[in-house]
Each structure stands twice: as structure tokens, then as C-alpha cells.
Swiss-Prot record:
Its job: Involved in the biosynthesis of isoprenoids. Catalyzes the 1,3-allylic rearrangement of the homoallylic substrate isopentenyl (IPP) to its allylic isomer, dimethylallyl diphosphate (DMAPP).
Catalyzed chemical reaction(s): isopentenyl diphosphate = dimethylallyl diphosphate
Source organism: Chlorobaculum tepidum (strain ATCC 49652 / DSM 12025 / NBRC 103806 / TLS) (Chlorobium tepidum)
Family matches, as InterPro entries: Aldolase_TIM, FMN-dep_DH, IPdP_isomerase
Family matches, as Gene3D superfamilies: Aldolase class I
The protein's name: Isopentenyl-diphosphate delta-isomerase
Compartments where found: Cytoplasm
Enzyme Commission code(s) on record: 5.3.3.2
Chain residues that bind Mg(2+): E166
Cited PANTHER family: ISOPENTENYL-DIPHOSPHATE DELTA-ISOMERASE
Highest taxon of the lineage: Bacteria
Length: 357
């Protein structure tokens, strides 16, 4: 029975990657909000472009640049090669990597190597295990979580929050009751940092406060503007049933594009941290529609410690341009730092940035 469930999960994961690569599932009429922000130009930067330092620290780990390869895949046959390539890129650029949901690894053993290959290909960078909020709410045990962490020798655990995706998923789990209490139990006992991550609808300051109070060390805002996982699941639903009968036609479009833009998430959490010093140690990851190194730079100036990307890097991997893309993004970031007079990532955090009129 468990192996049958694992097979269903594996098929779903394969379908997710295929849809993200080949169908129009990004937000429509809602962007990240980052284009609404502009850096103040520094005509006298007093910085040597060649000496700009992109390295930084994340959750106690030194990394090469403030970019994370975000949670994408694992748990089915083809994922092994994908995760090996992602791990090799993470190692080469010394950047963190999060694996996709590891639920399948708890349900069966058939594709566990598609996860463990990440550590063998990226032995020295931070790697993060991943499980969903519905599994946490359902009472996933500490031993089960430890199994996932040990499988990839993870430096931390991502708990992904995806209520909108689960709502649209044909076989979705929509019971989130008791989640925060169970999350608190996990953060208190698991022994590694926990990151709370949305999957594309964003995290408000109000929810960020609750998550921090539950013990998470970092928030990945994953705001609106990139992939809409509602649209991904809607594709799967229509492929299976042919027509949509769950939602009113007049409401469907808003639900498919539901979420808080990435920039809005960042600024609201930045305000929370400034007004409440007890949350100052909370790390913030900017994701959800990150397209280039300028988006990374703006994210850092708006309060993020690092940025993360999934779909853009997955597409680059499939086109054979992953390393070229990361290298280009790094140069974008360096250019933004040069033009704002920021020699280090710490200085970039204080660069002058304003909303366009």
C-alpha cells in the first residue's frame, strides 16, 4: 500500500516538472513588484568593480553568492540526473540547495537515491531537506523527519506552506489544523535550522511573526510573480477531468493568481523586524519570480539575506545553460553593487532604493 502511494507521488512529481517546463503557469496580471523599485545611482562609488565581494553567510554557512537553488524536484526516476546536475552547480558556485518535497522518500524506497545524490554531488555546501505543512500537521514524527535529514545529510529542514496548491491539487491535503503547534515541536527537537517556505503565494508579516514564534530560523517568502502552483494543479485537474467544476468561473482567475507579490512580502517583513528587535535574527529568503541578479540585489536592499530561484534555473538546466545563467546573475548582482557603491553584500543591504513614482 505504501509503495503504491509512493508511485502516485512519484508520478505527480514528474508531472509537476513537465508542466512547469512546458506550460504557461506563471502569474498573469500580477508580478513580483520588484520592477517598481529603483536603486539610487551612485556616481562616485569608490569601489573597484573587480574587488566586489559577493560572498555572504546564511544560517551559519559561508556561501559564494546570495543565491539558493530552490526546492524543485526528487522522488522519481528522471529526478536523479536533475538533482545531480543541480548539486554539481551548487558545489561549483558554493551556493545552498533545497531538494523538492521528500514525502515520497517516506512512502517508499524506490527513488531515494534521487535525493541522496544531491549530497554526493555537493559535499561542502548547505543542503536542505523538505517536507510539506500538511504532513507536519498530520503528525509526522521526529524519527521520520530525522530519516529525511539523514538521507541527504541535510544542514536544515524546509517546511513548505502550500494551502493554495493543495486546494487546487486533485488529491490535495487541505487539513492544516494544528500546524503551528506541531511546527513548534519540530523546531524545538529536530536539531537543525527550520526554514518555512511558501511556494508562490507569499508570506505576510503577520504569518512571518507566527512562524518565527514557532521557532523557524528563516522565512522563504516565495511571493506571487513566478510560478502559480494553482495553475500547475489546474493543468493536472483539467488533464484528468476535462473541465473545471469546483469554482465559479468569475472567481477562478483570481484564485489562480492569488498571492502577495514578492516585494510586498519583503518590505512588510523588513518593517516587522525593524519595529520588533526580537525578530532581528530571522533570516529572509526572497523567491517567487526571481529572474536575474538585479532582482537579487533589489531583494537584499529590501531586507532579504539571500534570494532563491526554481523555475528559471530548472529551465536553464534543461537548455544546458545552468552555469552560464548563474554566472550571468552573479555579474548582474556585481553590477548593481558597483553602481550603488556597495563593495560587500552587507553594504548592499544599506543601499538607497526607492519606489518608482
Amino acid at each position: 500500500m505504501q509503495e503504491a502511494s509512493a508511485a502516485i507521488t512519484a508520478e505527480r512529481k514528474h508531472s509537476h516538472v513537465d508542466i512547469c517546463l512546458n506550460r504557461p503557469v506563471c502569474f498573469d496580471g500580477q508580478d513580483t513588484g520588484l520592477d517598481s523599485w529603483r536603486f539610487e545611482h551612485n556616481a562616485a562609488p569608490e569601489v573597484d568593480f573587480a574587488q566586489i565581494d559577493l560572498s555572504t553567510e546564511f544560517l551559519g554557512h559561508a556561501i559564494g553568492l546570495p543565491l539558493m537553488i530552490s526546492s524543485m524536484t526528487g522522488g522519481y526516476g528522471n529526478a536523479l540526473a536533475l538533482n545531480r546536475a543541480l548539486g554539481e552547480a551548487a558545489e561549483r558556485f558554493r551556493i545552498p540547495l533545497g531538494v523538492g518535497s521528500m514525502r515520497q522518500a517516506l512512502e517508499g524506497s524506490s527513488h531515494r537515491e534521487s535525493f541522496s545524490v544531491v549530497r554526493s554531488s555537493a559535499p561542502s555546501v548547505p543542503i536542505f531537506a523538505n517536507i510539506g505543512a500538511p504532513e507536519v500537521a498530520a503528525g509526522l514524527s521526529r524519527d521520520q523527519l530525522s530519516t529525511l535529514i539523514d538521507l541527504i545529510e541535510a544542514n536544515g529542514l524546509i517546511v513548505h506552506l502550500n494551502p493554495a496548491q493543495e486546494l487546487f491539487q486533485p488529491e490535495g491535503g487541505t487539513d492544516f489544523s494544528g500546524f503551528l503547534d506541531r511546527l513548534h515541536d519540530i523546531t524545538a527537537t529536530i536539531g537543525v535550522p527550520v526554514i518555512a517556505k511558501e511556494v508562490g503565494c507569499g508570506i505576510s508579516a503577520t504569518v512571518a511573526r507566527k512562524l518565527a514564534d514557532a521557532g523557524v530560523r528563516a522565512i522563504d517568502v516565495a511571493g506571487a510573480g513566478g510560478i502559480s502552483w494553482q495553475k500547475v494543479e489546474e493543468c493536472r485537474y483539467l488533464d484528468r477531468f476535462g473541465h473545471e467544476e469546483r469554482f465559479s468561473p468569475s472567481a477562478l482567475d483570481e484564485f489562480l493568481n492569488w498571492g502577495i507579490p514578492t516585494a510586498e512580502c519583503l518590505t512588510s517583513i523588513q518593517t516587522l523586524k525593524r519595529q520588533n528587535p526580537e525578530y532581528d535574527a530571522l533570516s529572509v529568503i526572497s523567491s517567487g519570480g526571481i529572474r536575474n541578479g538585479l532582482d537579487i540585489a533589489k531583494s537584499i536592499a529590501l531586507g532579504a539575506n539571500i534570494a532563491a530561484s526554481a523555475q528559471h534555473l530548472l529551465k536553464a538546466l534543461h537548455s544546458g545553460t545552468l552555469e552560464e545563467t548563474i554566472r550571468t546573475w552573479a555579474n548582474d548582482l556585481r553590477a548593481a553593487m558597483f553602481l550603488t557603491g556597495s563593495a560587500t553584500i552587507e553594504q548592499l543591504k544599506h543601499a538607497r532604493i526607492y519606489r518608482k513614482p
